[in-house]
Swiss-Prot record:
GO terms for molecular function: ADP binding; ATP binding; proton-transporting ATP synthase activity, rotational mechanism. This is ATP synthase subunit alpha. Keywords: ATP synthesis, ATP-binding, Cell inner membrane, Cell membrane, CF(1), Hydrogen ion transport, Ion transport, Membrane, Nucleotide-binding, Translocase, Transport. Pfam families: ATP-synt_ab, ATP-synt_ab_C, ATP-synt_ab_N. The lineage of its organism: Bacteria, Pseudomonadati, Pseudomonadota, Betaproteobacteria, Burkholderiales. The keyword Cell membrane applies.
Length: 512
């Protein structure tokens, strides 16, 4: 039998063309070891840093260490089902989370998946969690206020849209309470809020969500929760997830506020991941890039100009600036702000609000130490009404604290010193504020005006808050138009001042 090479080649060619096998060309490797949510994979030569890796059972991991012959990855989720020898595939994608208005009012985990039992989130868009912060040219200076509704903050440590203001203090000093009050006060201020809970007890997160719901704040808030029961990897990425969700609004000419509660726990989670990946430890066993961990996150909070927004939206939004304001929280140990992570975050942010245990225990809440709390850029954003009335407050408090220390040892004090001490005691009392009760700018202005003009000088210290409460009620019922005017203009003209003066004087006569 004679073989015809041409026929054979034709036959082979037709067979190959008729072959219907689907091919899946992807870089794949093998699991070498699994320990504490960290997986070593051999053979993934094309993996990118930060790439999503696919494990059996629809489990995903994040490639963090790219070494010569292996890849170190963290598992996002349950890792109990992964065993040595399993096949791992590259996905070619960087970790993405859902973004957009569909997330508002929901509680999600670090991957953007709903955990509140209210059904799926049909978000139309996703975005990568690691992004480069806007450059210098894209930014605009901070000149619009973020009203927290807290007298001590809005008068002495004002916050502007696009600022990063650190809330720092020991445990149980009211750090979360300050942040939650700031979120509650954004009602009607055209501000979308993101609350990122990192490494907290699930019960604490539930309490925060309940407080936000009762105040009607969940209507404009997204909660990203990575509780203490979640893996270190989930706690580490949750801050970036929340930031990406906030950036969606910033880049479209809207304003957003994000609270990271707290970054100390995120740093600890990152330290755990780094040590398990065998990265060399440095000071306090943190890895060498722990500064970069927080700087690349907090630099993404910025106020961007109209050109940036127009270019980003391809001309859909014109003439609008966007902002992302960050309120990171740091927990200190016994008031030690010179520890590694606190000093890092202090140097990255645009100011800090110090909360002190001694003040908190003395009943001064919020327990803000006015002497060492600063806002480096917020002064330009403060409203005229509050700025004009709060100038003397910080000075009064500073002098009071200084004199109070000496007054303990002095038996007889001259009249001017006694007057300063009395005034300081009243100012301190007046700056106290109950939780979940932020004040509108008009009532805050009235309070500051009353203390500045000496209307409280002859009121007993223990009756100061009752006087304030009564005055607010009187103004709401008898001078609603004046309050409305102050809210709208955010300034105190001569007519408004005359009416306010008359109203406070009239109320004081009736106050017993």
């Amino acid at each position: 039998m004679q073989l015809n090479p041409a026929e054979i080649s034709e036959l082979i060619k037709s067979r190959i063309e008729g072959l219907g096998a689907a091919t899946d060309v992807r870089n794949q490797g093998t699991v070498v070891s699994v320990t504490d949510g960290i997986v070593r994979v051999h053979g993934l030569s094309d993996a990118m840093a930060g790439e999503m890796l696919e494990f059996p059972g629809n489990v995903f991991g994040l490639a963090l260490n790219l070494e010569r012959d292996s890849v170190g990855a963290v598992i996002l989720g349950e890792y109990e089902g992964i065993s040595e020898g399993d096949t791992v595939r590259c996905t070619g994608r960087i970790l993405e989370v859902p973004v957009g208005p569909e997330l508002i009012g929901r509680v999600v985990n670090a991957l953007g998946q709903p955990i509140d039992g209210k059904g799926p989130i049909n978000a139309k868009m996703t975005d990568v969690i690691e992004k480069v912060a806007p450059g210098v040219i894209a930014r605009k200076s901070v000149d619009q206020p973020v009203q927290t509704g807290l007298k001590s903050i809005d008068s002495m440590v004002p916050i502007g849209r696009g600022q990063r203001e650190l809330i720092i203090g020991d445990r149980q000093t009211g750090k979360t309470a300050v942040a939650i009050d700031a979120i509650i006060n954004q009602k009607g201020q055209n501000m979308t809020c993101v609350y990122v809970a990192i490494g907290q007890k699930a019960s604490s997160i539930k309490n925060v969500v309940r407080a936000l719901e009762q105040a009607g704040a969940m209507e404009y808030t997204i909660v990203v929760a990575a509780s203490a029961s979640e893996s270190a990897a989930m706690q580490y990425i949750s801050a970036y997830t929340g930031c990406t969700m906030g950036e969606y609004f910033r880049d479209r000419g809207e304003d957003a506020l994000i609270v990271y509660d707290d970054l100390s726990k995120q740093a600890v989670a990152y330290r755990q991941v780094s040590l398990l990946l065998r990265r060399p430890p440095g000071r306090e066993a943190f890895p060498g890039d722990v500064f970069y961990l927080h700087s690349r996150l907090l630099e993404r909070a910025a106020r961007v100009n109209a050109d940036y927004v127009e270019a980003f939206t391809k001309g859909a939004v014109k003439g609008k600036t966007g902002s992302l304001t960050a309120l990171p929280v740091i927990e200190t140990q016994a008031g030690d702000v010179s520890a590694f992570v606190p000093t890092n975050v202090i140097s990255i942010t645009d100011g800090q609000i110090f909360l002190e245990t001694s003040l908190f225990n003395a009943g001064i809440r919020p327990a803000i130490n006015a002497g060492i709390s600063v806002s480096r850029v917020g002064g330009a954003a403060q409203t005229k009404l509050i700025k004009g009335l709060s100038g003397g407050i910080r000075t009064d408090l500073a002098q009071y604290r200084e004199l109070a220390a000496f007054a303990q040892f002095a038996s007889d004090l001259d009249a001017s010193t006694r007057k300063q001490l009395d005034r300081g005691a009243r100012v301190t009392e007046l700056l106290k504020q109950a939780q979940y009760s932020p004040q509108p700018i008009s009532l805050m202005g009235a309070t500051l005006y009353a203390v500045n003009k000496g209307y409280l000088d002859d009121i007993e210290v223990k009756k100061v808050l009752a006087f304030e409460s009564g005055m607010h009620q009187y103004l709401k019922t008898s001078h609603a138009a004046l309050l409305q005017k102050l809210e709208t203009t955010k300034a105190l003209d001569k007519d408004a001042e005359a009416e306010l003066q008359g109203a406070i004087a009239a109320f004081k006569k009736s106050f017993a």
